[in-house]
């Protein structure tokens, strides 16, 4: 594994931790708190950084896992923007049901992409 791939793997694990704190905070409070939005934004930054490291380290832009990862990153980016917009417009108001469910779906999809990457490495593909 190249140093860039190692950096990407380490960074994506940090993104997982950050996304998890952000999503769990939002889901439990049913509100977009400052803490939740901070961890979601950090997660997106780490995720983008990890994605760039992995593309450069692997030398391939388009793979099946890459497409899965890009779509998962896009989902979390949209979730973060929607959560931030809700916070700006509604302050501490309860998160609407649709946003609450979208958060779960985007996070679940991201975890699927994360796990599939680990499985691909474990299976040597």
Where in this protein do the model-derived segments appear?
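Hydrophobic transmembrane alpha-helical segments in integral membrane proteins
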Residues: 1-17
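Hydrophobic, membrane-facing alpha-helical anchors
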Residues: 12-31
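Membrane-helix exit/interface motif
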Residues: 21-25, 46-60, 82-89
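Loop-to-helix transition at the N-terminal end of transmembrane alpha-helices
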Residues: 29-47
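Divalent metal-coordination and catalytic microenvironments
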Residues: 39, 65, 110
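Short alpha-helical packing/oligomerization segments
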Residues: 56-84
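Individual transmembrane alpha-helices with interfacial aromatic-anchor signatures
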Residues: 99-112
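Juxtamembrane boundary at the C-terminal end of a transmembrane helix
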Residues: 115-125
């Amino acid at each position: 594994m190249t140093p860039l791939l190692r950096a990407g793997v380490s960074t994506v694990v940090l993104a997982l931790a950050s996304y998890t704190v952000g999503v769990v905070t939002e889901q439990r409070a049913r509100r977009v708190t400052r803490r939740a939005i901070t961890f979601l934004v950090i997660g997106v930054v780490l995720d983008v950084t990890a994605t760039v490291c992995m593309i450069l380290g692997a030398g391939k832009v388009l793979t099946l896992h890459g497409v899965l990862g890009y779509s998962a990153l896009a989902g979390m980016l949209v979730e973060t923007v929607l959560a931030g917009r809700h916070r700006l417009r509604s302050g501490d108001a309860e998160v609407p049901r649709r946003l609450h469910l979208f958060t779960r779906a985007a996070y679940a999809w991201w975890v699927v992409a994360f796990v599939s990457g680990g499985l691909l490495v474990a299976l040597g593909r």
